[in-house]
Structure formats: C-alpha cells, structure tokens
Amino acid sequence: MPADELNHSLSWIVVVGDVFGRPGRKALSLGLEKISSQRRVVFTVINGENLAGGKGVNTKTAQECFDMGVSVITTGNHLFDQKGVIDLLQKDGKVLRPLNYSSLCPGVGSGIYVLDNGLRVGVLNLIGRVFMAPSDCPFHAADQVLSGWSDQGISPDLVLVDFHGEASGEKRAMGFHLDGRVAAMYGTHTHVQTNDLEQLPGGSWYLTDVGLSGPHWSVIGVAPEMALSKYRTHVPAPFTVGEGELLFCALLLGISSTSNGVRIEKAELFREVFP
C-alpha cells in the first residue's frame, strides 16, 4: 500500500515531548494543525512540565493545550514550579504527575482514556532516578500499574509510557523491561530528539527522546546568550526563553483495529521548523 494511502487508512496517536514556554505552545499549535491536515488524529499526549515560561505547568497553559486538541499532559521534575498545580493535578486525571513519586503526592501517574471510537488508551508517566532527584523505583511502579489493570480485567487496548529521564541507559533498560507489555515507551526531558526509533524484540516501540517543541535557535529552550554566560562564567544567569524560529518534534503512531486487537502499524518521527 502506498505511504499516503496507508497514512489515511490508519488512526494516529501524536506524542509530543517537552513543550517549552510560549514558543513551544505556538510550535505545538502549528505542528498539530499540520499533522491533523494529513492524518486522522485520535489521541494526543504531550509532556507539559515546561509549558509555563519553561518551568512547570499552570491552569492557563494546560487549558490552552487542551483547546488545541491535546488529550493528556504528562510532566516531570519541574511539575511543582508553578502555583496552583496541585488543583490541576486533582481535577480530572488529564494532567499526570510522575507515577513513582510518593504515594502521598497529589494527583495520579497513570490513567486509561476512552476515545470517541471506543479505543482505550493507557498512559504511564514515569521519572528516572539516574542524575535526577530521588524518587521511588520506576520499574516497580510500572509493574504495579500494569499488573493491577490486568488483575482487575481493565487492561487498555494499548499503553503508552513517558519515561522522563536524564540517562539514555536507564531509558533503554526501561524499554526492555516493558517490551511486549506496552505499545510504546518513549523518553522525554533531554529536549533533543534521538534517531533510535525502533521496534524491540517483544513488539514494543522504543525512542530514547521525543525532543523539544520550542525555540529552535536555543540551548534546549533557553536563550543561547543566557546559557553561554552561565557555562563560561559559572555565575547563575537569568532564565530566559529563546526566541525566533519554532521547532516542533513528535512521535507519530499509526494504529489499526482488527478482530485480533489494536496494534501499531507504523511509527515515525516528525520534526519541523516553523518561521
């Protein structure tokens, strides 16, 4: 089947990595608009820990993304950098916090979302422990949720896992740990899209990092002059979001439903720079 014909025959899940500040939200809007004009998008998940000024998420920025068609927002280490986020976490389960934070932490780190076509998509939001602040074991946390869904007879049609981590080795290990039990495991946090999208031996799709959506000419979102000043002088510099051209990075998952279940037929990286 020709590529264009296959693209139109599938339903698509759009996975967007760290959306950085106002430029990231604009890039998100432009990117989703372009993808939706070419494919039938049924579900969109983004990492929103940098939505508000590059640090954290608040009600205004989250709602702006939901108005664009975003289904679920995952987060990471900057989750609590904005006021009012606890109310957001306790609202409706559409903004997740890292699953392997303390059980006393407000909000939830996983959810099952029912689409208009009846498809049930599970999302897990994990955070790494290598070169990151202390947290509970992400491997055990993932096992608990997946086995819990299975024991209750509510396992979703497919599961997506956002592993928000610094170390590629830790992400890779999680990929193999979950292989065959989830549809896709992808990394966020480093803001650099990696070129290692592949299907693991057990059938799960894996990507080390989806990449940044935000200012293209920046140091992972920050204005270059600010980042350079800090690196060269060791003197803390004001945190300033970069400007100019917009970069949009995403992972696209084309899914089909048959009598044998739901499966990912096609996975591809998407990267575009908007003027």
Residue ranges of predicted features:
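Acidic, metal/ion-coordinating pockets
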Residues: 2-275
